[in-house]
Amino acid sequence: MTDRENQESPNKDNVTGDSISKYRIMVVDDNKDILRMLKMGLEGSGFSIDAYSDPFTVLSVFKTIYGNKTETPIRMPYDLLLIDVKMPELNGVELTKEIKKLAANANVTPPPICFITAFDEYYEILRDLFPNNKHDPDICLIHKPIEIENLTTRLKHEIALHK
């Protein structure tokens, strides 16, 4: 997309043609510099971003979301989760497993999840996430280093797949 096309149709999603400003993404990374870069870059691309550096805070957010025991269906506020794999105390894989447990207990589907990972962690993640080679289509892997333009395209694609 050229600069002129961006000016004529700001925040247009090439995948669906919809405005991406309606898409809300939770970004989780313990490295505050990377978190800030991702937040600024993705917001600059038109996404609404909630950024967290502490995975335990993220768990609290999801406990609140999935703890809604009213008659009304749970409204998931996030279209996608972007989670770093390597975090101290609670890594991205463990965080994802906890979020999926909370969702299962609430009888809802969690949002799609994209992991940010260094290439050498790839097979370790696959082994931990997909035991017995049972693939989870709601999870994608994004390799470092990250280029915001490529990341934006990938996230729009992942969101479109799950709409």
Model-predicted segments: where are they?
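Non-catalytic signal-transmission and effector/linker regions of two-component phosphorelay proteins
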Residues: M1-M26, K32-K39, K63-P77, A106-T109, ...
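Conserved sequence signature across two-component system core domains
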Residues: V28-D29, Y52, L81
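The feature encodes the CheY-like receiver
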Residues: L35, P88, E121
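Residue-level signal for the "D+5" position in two-component response regulator receiver
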Residues: A51, E89-L90
